[in-house]
C-alpha cells in the first residue's frame, strides 16, 4: 500500500491526506490468509489532551478521530481469528510499513509469534540481526527500522477453532 506523495501539501490539507490514505489501508493488506482466518486492523495515534484538572495527558485516539503530523507515532494493531471449525497451522500475518512512515525499532509485538522483517518489498524476510542494506555511499550496513518495508508474524502453535490473537507495531510519520 502506498500513501500518495505529500510534496506540496501543507497544513491541514497535508495532514488530512495522510490520515485519509492510512484509513484506506485494508486490514493486513498482504496477509497470507488460510481458509477460515480473518484479519482486521486498527490504527491509533497518541495525542495530548487536557483532563478535568487541566493537566495534559497522553491518550490513544483512533486514527479516524485524530490528525497526524511528522514525528507522530501511529500504532497498527492487527487481530487474527480462526473462524474455521478446525485448528489452523502455519498462520502468517504480513503487513507493509506504509510509505511516508518509518518503523519504530523494537516496537513489533506478537505473543507466541516469530517476528521477521523485509527490506526488499516483502520478497525475503529475516531477523533484524541478519538484515543488511546498501547505504547511499555504496557500503553494506545493518538494516534499521526506517529500512523495513514489511513485517511478518508467524504464529508458532496451531490456532484453535475460535481462537484469536493480536500483533502490532509502531511507525512514525516522516
Q: Residue ranges of each PLM-predicted region?
A:
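Exported/extracytosolic protein signature
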Residues: 2-3, 29-174
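Bacterial N-terminal signal peptides that target proteins for export
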Residues: 2-18
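Bacterial N-terminal signal peptides
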Residues: 15-27
